[in-house]
Amino acid sequence: MLLLELVFFAVLFPVGDTQDAFQEPISFHITQITSFVNSSWVKYQLSGWLGDLQIHGMDSDSGTAIFLKPWSKGNFSNEEMSEVVELFRVYIVAFIRETKAHVNALQMEYPFEIQGIAGCELHSGGAIVSFLQGAFGGLDFVSFKNSSCVPAPEGGSRAQTVCKLLAPYHDIFYTVEKLLYETCPQYLLGVLQAGKADLHRQVKPKAWLSSGSTHEPGHLQLVCHVSGFYPKPVWVMWMRGEQELPETQRGDILPNADGTWYLRVTLDVVTEEATGLSCRVKHSSLGGQDIVLYWGHSNPIGWVILAIVSCLIFFLCFALWYFRRLRCEGIF
């Protein structure tokens, strides 16, 4: 039976009956990465995501589910969740076994990697779109559409063979369809409600400027750091007056340990042209009050530190003078 357990990859944690509206589409999806190093060594990663936020994991050694948020189970009971976790354990074992059993038939050579993603996405109008896709070696392989397995062009004859072998198992496709189009939407709406306070929090970004190295003589790299913001969407741009500079280079938005985000935005300029440039930051938590940092302007925090240090030096000098005077007068 060729990779029949693949369909269980669409099993999602069912719960919930309340819809929570989001301005941007948001999805719940499960991702799996299985690396077949050789016939006896296989590694896998299984995780559940709400948008860009990981809320589930699984210990690959023990098969124990990891709930990363207090609300990761949504409204699902412990008993129901235990049943789903057990299903995943069975699925992983069977998926690895069946894949290894058909390595030769599908002309796969070690090492190779299989990826998969399954879930559903809620749009602002209330529509929910479900999906299940598999990849082989980073290329699209198969997907689930209209109650059937659809081979991807990149998958070639190998993907076509997999879909042909799965085609007779109508009960399996019925189960997948039910999970994708009924179970997943129920869970998505439920977990959005359970995690509402956390998901809707607004954390203001902190921003600062620095300089970076550049390989061109006479040039300067301006770096604008933006950190500690939530939610993830943010707009950062180097500006000259009110004009956006298209040469701005935006890095990847990276996660901080506390669940907030960090972004680094750079601009390479001729050193003499850096004066008058600024970095502008827009974020939903700022209430329309953009952060604007001007290159070359002194940092207010720096002035505060300088003032404190100056005061300390003054009082130290005064104390030394005072005690010296007392000593000269014979008091000490």
From Swiss-Prot:
Residues 185-295 form the Ig-like domain. Residues 18-300 are extracellular. Keywords: Adaptive immunity, Cell membrane, Disulfide bond, Endosome, Glycoprotein, Immunity, Immunoglobulin domain, Lysosome, Membrane, Signal, Transmembrane, Transmembrane helix. Residues 322-332 are cytoplasmic. Residues 1-17 form the signal peptide. It is a single-pass type I membrane protein. One of its GO terms (biological process) is adaptive immune response. GO terms for molecular function: endogenous lipid antigen binding; exogenous lipid antigen binding; lipopeptide binding. The keyword Transmembrane helix applies. SMART domains: IGc1. It is found in: Cell membrane; Endosome membrane; Lysosome membrane. It holds the Pfam family C1-set. The chain crosses the membrane at residues 301-321. InterPro entries: Ig-like_dom, Ig-like_dom_sf, Ig-like_fold, Ig_C1-set, MHC_class-I_related, MHC_I-like_Ag-recog, MHC_I-like_Ag-recog_sf, MHC_I/II-like_Ag-recog. Disulfide bonds join 120-184, 149-163, 224-279. A motif (Internalization signal) lies at residues 328-331. PANTHER family: MHC CLASS I-RELATED, T-CELL SURFACE GLYCOPROTEIN CD1B. Heterodimer with B2M (beta-2-microglobulin). Interacts with saposin C. During protein synthesis and maturation, CD1 family members bind endogenous lipids that are replaced by lipid or glycolipid antigens when the proteins are internalized and pass through endosomes or lysosomes, before trafficking back to the cell surface. Interaction with saposin C is required for the loading of bacterial lipid antigens onto CD1B in the lysosome. Antigen-presenting protein that binds self and non-self lipid and glycolipid antigens and presents them to T-cell receptors on natural killer T-cells. This is T-cell surface glycoprotein CD1b3. It comes from Cavia porcellus. The lineage of its organism: Eukaryota, Metazoa, Chordata, Craniata, Vertebrata.
